[in-house]
């Protein structure tokens, strides 16, 4: 009897130390989106890296469909914008939909009967491209329905049964418009017109957000480049939506390979002209934090009439064009001003399956607990030390010396904190690009501890068989922990076990940081596109949120400064002739403290 009781007691202890605390129904998400991401072919030593960009989402018959550049060679379908399933085109339309097993920046739109797809083919010898459509995209059944002129970065917009195309890419192409017959797809004679002229000289740019193509990369401060920007922007990725009888035409600038990649919006009462660039631009900007970039976007409505933006975010580790997909809420206020909510846009956001206020679901309170925390690992490659998995930077990473099961990474959170969710951003280190597709999955276990010695398993993904490069785990109930540990079970494509960052979200049981004092702004009088902000250091802050906008009630721009020691920032993205208003907020592991707005 004594032996039986001992066995029962031991089994109870083991079960209490090996709970799987993953939420059964995920209600939050965290950028970048946790997709499997296709293996884009790049001219690098590794030859391949995960990537996707230039996204389009359409809602069709109650389901969402996601199309992205240089990804899986197909598309994805979802019921809730969280869980996605891969779908592939039927073989009959491969020649129409794909170039070398992928497609680039397609035009996708839906009406009540069909989803339409037009590829941006890279074959410059082609004068026309096919239009394909599907009444059953969930099962990958498509057919050809017409042809249109070859376009760079096309956008198809359907309005009251009429079909319009917008296109243009690069410093030598304007944003151009034309209409097609909705049945034959023949171009309507005389409908073609230029909506926005291209830029030939960077000095003619009225707004500084046009600066920095292949000059700025992941810097958040433009001091080293003031007066030196020379490259013309690469405007691209037109997108059009209609709200309250107004048309909103977006395009991306200055170029996709940087954190400053953003969207600009123009408004008009007409679908085919009269578009005016808005003083609150850029309409979509995400600079600072773990990952940046918010350009070449698609704005769409969900099932509950909420607006969203799906967008391109920049990584650039194995190739300049290595990118990810982000999702942000969008709003239109009573004045018709469009706003993309990107503040702390790589922190957890709620995704309620109902009508919501974007201010309530973004940056809603689960704060980062892992920034610059002490760490250790089972092994580390030279140059890829463990601290690079806690630095809040998608462009650095830790790598173990092998991909063997049992390699691990441990983070000391410095104190006991509440943990609500964890984002595990896996890196690709020394992969074998020719490894079988069946090897492309992540498997791991996650543990917590209060002393760094006695571990309790909270997540068991040892039997996982799919790729989860930006795994986001929402816990069913919050846990308290002082340490967190991830242990490798399997790494994709024979690579080494590696992490871009292990990010822990919850509450740090600290006081919120203090208020920023003595904020001052010096607008450059010789070049109003620049302004220098300075403020006093705030102890207890993990960083600062530099907010600004053209009206004190519309501070829609934000640059995240991830270091409490940094107390100045040179902005370069302002517009000549526009007066700005500024505020600097502080944040830490327990919340955000709003600053005081000052005006020029």
Describe each PLM feature range.
Residues 264, 442, 471-472, 565-570:
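Short S/T/G- and acidic-enriched coil/turn segments that sit immediately N-terminal to beta-strands
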Residues 391-459, 469-515:
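Aromatic, loop-rich ligand-recognition surfaces of beta-strand-rich domains
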Residues 462-466, 559-566:
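Short beta-strand segments within Ig-like beta-sandwich modules, predominantly Fibronectin type-III
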Residues 505-540, 576, 590-600:
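Pro/Thr/Ser/Gly-rich low-complexity, intrinsically disordered linker/stalk tracts
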């Amino acid at each position: 009897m004594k032996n039986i009781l001992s066995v029962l007691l031991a089994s109870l202890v083991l079960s209490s130390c090996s709970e799987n605390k993953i939420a059964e129904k995920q209600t939050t998400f965290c950028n970048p989106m946790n997709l499997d991401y296709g293996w884009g072919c790049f001219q690098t030593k590794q030859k391949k890296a995960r990537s996707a960009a230039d996204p389009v989402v359409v809602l069709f018959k109650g389901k969402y469909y996601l199309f992205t550049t240089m990804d899986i060679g197909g598309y994805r379908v979802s019921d809730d914008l969280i869980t996605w399933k891969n779908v592939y085109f039927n073989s009959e339309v491969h020649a129409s939909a794909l170039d070398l097993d992928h497609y680039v920046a397609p035009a996708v739109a839906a009406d009540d009967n069909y989803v339409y797809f037009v590829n941006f083919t890279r074959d410059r010898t082609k004068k026309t491209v096919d239009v394909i459509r599907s009444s059953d995209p969930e099962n990958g059944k498509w057919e050809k329905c017409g042809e249109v002129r070859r376009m760079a970065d096309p956008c198809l917009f359907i309005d009251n049964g009429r079909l319009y195309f917008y296109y243009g890419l690069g410093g030598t192409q304007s944003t151009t418009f034309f209409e097609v017959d909705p049945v034959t797809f023949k171009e309507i004679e005389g409908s073609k017109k230029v909506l926005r002229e291209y830029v030939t000289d960077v000095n003619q740019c009225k707004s500084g957000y046009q600066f920095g193509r292949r000059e700025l990369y992941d810097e958040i401060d433009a001091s080293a480049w003031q007066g030196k920007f020379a490259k013309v922007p690469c405007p691209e990725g037109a997108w059009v939506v209609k709200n309250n009888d107004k048309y909103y035409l977006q395009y991306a600038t200055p170029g996709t390979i940087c954190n400053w990649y953003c969207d600009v919006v123009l408004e008009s009462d007409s679908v085919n002209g009269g578009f005016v660039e808005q003083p609150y631009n850029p309409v979509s900007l995400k600079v600072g934090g773990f990952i940046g970039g918010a350009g070449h976007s698609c704005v769409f409505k969900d099932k509950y009439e909420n607006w969203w933006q799906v967008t391109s975010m920049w990584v650039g580790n194995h190739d300049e064009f290595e990118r990810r997909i982000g999702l942000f809420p969008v709003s239109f206020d009573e004045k018709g001003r469009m706003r993309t909510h990107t503040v702390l846009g790589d922190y957890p956001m709620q995704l309620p399956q109902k009508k919501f206020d974007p201010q309530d679901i973004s940056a809603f309170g689960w704060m980062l607990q892992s920034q610059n925390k002490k760490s250790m690992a089972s092994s580390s490659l030279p140059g890829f030390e463990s601290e690079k998995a806690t630095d809040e930077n998608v462009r650095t990473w830790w790598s173990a010396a092998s991909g063997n099961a049992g390699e691990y990474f441990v983070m000391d959170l410095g104190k006991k904190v509440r943990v609500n969710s964890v984002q595990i951003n896996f890196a690709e280190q020394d992969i074998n690009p020719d490894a079988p597709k069946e090897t492309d999955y992540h498997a791991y276990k996650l543990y917590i501890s209060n002393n760094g010695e006695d571990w309790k398993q909270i997540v068991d993904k040892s039997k996982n068989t799919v790729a989860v490069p930006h795994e986001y785990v929402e816990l069913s109930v919050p846990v308290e922990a002082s340490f967190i540990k991830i242990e490798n079970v399997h790494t994709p494509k024979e690579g080494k076990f590696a992490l871009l960052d292990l990010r822990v979200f919850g509450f740090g049981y600290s006081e919120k940081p203090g208020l920023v004092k003595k904020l001052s702004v010096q607008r450059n009088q010789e070049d109003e596109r620049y302004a220098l902000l300075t403020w006093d250091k705030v102890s207890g802050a993990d960083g600062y949120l530099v907010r600004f906008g053209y009206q004190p009630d519309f501070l829609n721009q934000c640059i995240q400064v991830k270091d409490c020691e940094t107390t100045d920032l040179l902005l370069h993205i302002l517009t000549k002739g526009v007066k700005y208003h500024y505020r600097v907020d502080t944040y830490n592991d327990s919340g955000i403290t709003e600053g005081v707005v000052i005006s020029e």
